[in-house]
């Protein structure tokens, strides 16, 4: 079940309005694990997984002056999902925090958890209908961070014991047929994780089966 509401003035690189969603999902299915390198001590496992997932997200933009807009966002997620056979499988199936287009197309274990809180702020300088400069800073805090033991099994760490952040600055040129975006961003983990990129056109992501 999902409830969505939006008054944004653009699907991407919006500067006015807000977007809000509340999603509740129930999943059930079978999980099968086959070792990649079978040994005498390894074995195939089959488990049934059932879990509840509830998420809420809202972001909004407020016009402070004709040339300056201040945006913000908040996101919360809770999932009762159990651990998978090993740490890698657990992290692959954990929910991710991906507020930027770049973060949506990359895999980063530091920004994944079964329960988390996140928030961000987005100062935007709007020069005209064509050009804008966006700066974004986000904080991500797992309620229970997922860790790995010596046997490559997942376990929960101490509550609220980890904090991650990411920041991005981008220059946007809006054209009738698409947008040109040049960006640089930084993730707190892995260390020294910097990225520079250029995108042409629109990056519009469809709804996922597991939100």
Describe the residue ranges of each PLM region.
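Outer-membrane beta-barrel transmembrane domain signature
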Residues: 110-118, 122-167
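Outer-membrane beta-barrel initiation region
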Residues: 2-14, 127-132, 146-148, 161, ...
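Short connector loops/turns at beta-strand edges and beta->alpha or beta->beta junctions
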Residues: 27-29, 142, 176
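Hydrophobic beta-strand residues in large extracellular and virion-surface proteins
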Residues: 70, 74, 121, 131-135, ...
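Outer-membrane beta-barrel "beta-signal"
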Residues: 171-178, 193-211
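C-terminal outer-membrane beta-barrel translocator/porin domains of Gram-negative envelope proteins
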Residues: 1-128, 135
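A short, acidic, flexible beta-alpha connecting loop/helix-capping segment that sits on the rim
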Residues: 185-191
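C-terminal structured domain segments
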Residues: 158-185
């Amino acid at each position: 079940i999902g409830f969505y509401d939006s008054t944004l003035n653009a699907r991407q690189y919006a500067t006015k309005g807000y977007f809000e969603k509340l999603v509740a999902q129930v999943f059930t299915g079978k999980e099968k694990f086959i070792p990649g390198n079978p040994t005498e001590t390894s074995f195939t496992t089959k488990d049934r997984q059932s879990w509840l997932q509830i998420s809420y997200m809202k972001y909004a933009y407020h016009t402070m002056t004709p040339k300056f807009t201040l945006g913000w966002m908040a996101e919360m997620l809770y999932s009762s999902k159990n651990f998978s056979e090993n740490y890698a499988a657990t992290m692959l199936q954990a929910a991710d925090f991906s507020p930027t287009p770049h973060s949506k197309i990359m895999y980063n274990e530091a920004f994944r958890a079964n329960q988390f809180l996140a928030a961000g702020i987005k100062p935007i300088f709007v020069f005209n209908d064509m050009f804008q400069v966006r700066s974004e800073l986000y904080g991500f805090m797992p309620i229970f961070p997922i860790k790995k033991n010596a046997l490559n099994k997942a376990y929960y760490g101490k509550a609220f014991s980890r904090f991650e952040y990411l920041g991005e600055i981008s220059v946007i040129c809006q054209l009738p047929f698409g947008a040109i975006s040049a960006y640089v961003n930084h993730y707190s983990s892995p260390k020294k994780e910097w990225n520079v990129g250029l995108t042409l056109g629109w990056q519009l992501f469809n709804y996922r089966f597991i939100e």
